[in-house]
């Protein structure tokens, strides 16, 4: 029982006493579960003031620019760890020992192959299909091939499904790209890192093997780390909602991919790149900045600011550093990259952007990095999904471990009252 109480008075009647729950960090939460028995519900479109669950995985303080995974700051994880170690931490709650890490890495590495019949499913899609459409379909179809791990009430089944998803997602993502450009699939190699293996499957061809550049490999690894989890966002909430019905893990992750595909969620870095293409040249920047400052103009600078972070996005600091490392390594000369760098300079120095805290966010820099690496914008959200899979799995697993009720939101009904029906159609 909570020590602190909140009182809600309805129409001047006796106050309803509600528990106030306190977490380890963050805002207090009023427990409203008893309100339904009083004949009222709360109204919170978008759930911006609603804690939909209890979780121990990720903490965000948007005002202070803090992001913690299992208590570890994201900047420390991005600079001092690697993606697979972060995966272990998200899934298990603690840092791995060397032995635990080696075993985890080996298990992931040995399950990167996908069933050969799955490769034939790609041919059921048009080659000009958006890669996210293909990812939704292929991921959901995994349940038809790996039905020996679909019992969500069995902890061992959940663990097997988690490893399969984490292991096979880079393979499927790279195959989406290869299929879209008409090149043969490249199979995974067990001698490469998680990020290096993905890059090899993306860019290697039978006639020209791909040599993994360590700078680009590390950059990709950081992109994966920085997108691994972000608390109860739209796609994670979608995974939890789907999972609350007892749906199998592959279906739940496919649902998360579908939610992530939305331009307001996972498509932000692709949208930022399209904005740079619209600006097209450094000489056009002043005009677009003027438009961005005009509240009556529909133009918005994409890749700046964040719904949660009212301070600098803690992921953006590491991503900015990585971005400059990649551009220096590649010596890339590109008009859009020049536009991006000038926009960054303006945003970090212009009083308007500073006052409104419209700093470049992680999507702004990740889009630049991926473009410089030769990855098309249509693949940006696929890579986001690949990175976020571990976060989705962690939340899905936590939900099942803690016990859950099927999600069933209520509504504020504003339609017709009851009325009689008499058809005007001749039958």
UniProtKB/Swiss-Prot annotation:
Keyword flag Cell membrane: no
Protein family per UniProt: Belongs to the citrate synthase family.
Subunit composition and interactions: Homohexamer.
GO-annotated molecular function: citrate (Si)-synthase activity; identical protein binding; NADH binding
SUPFAM superfamilies: Citrate synthase (SSF48256)
Residue positions of the active site: 306, 363
Gene Ontology biological-process entries: protein hexamerization; tricarboxylic acid cycle
InterPro entries xrefs: Citrate_synth-like_lrg_a-sub, Citrate_synth-like_sm_a-sub, Citrate_synthase, Citrate_synthase_AS, Citrate_synthase_bac-typ, Citrate_synthase_sf, Citrate_synthase_typ-I
Principal EC category: transferase
Modified residues annotated as N6-acetyllysine in this record: 283
Keywords noted in UniProt: Acetylation, Allosteric enzyme, Transferase, Tricarboxylic acid cycle
Any single Pfam family the record assigns to this protein: Citrate_synt
Organism: Escherichia coli (strain K12)
Miscellaneous section: Citrate synthase is found in nearly all cells capable of oxidative metabolism.
GO CC terms of this entry: cytosol
Identification of the protein by name: Citrate synthase
E.C. no: 2.3.3.16
PANTHER family for this protein: CITRATE SYNTHASE
Pathway: Carbohydrate metabolism; tricarboxylic acid cycle; isocitrate from oxaloacetate: step 1/2
Reaction equations catalysed: oxaloacetate + acetyl-CoA + H2O = citrate + CoA + H(+)
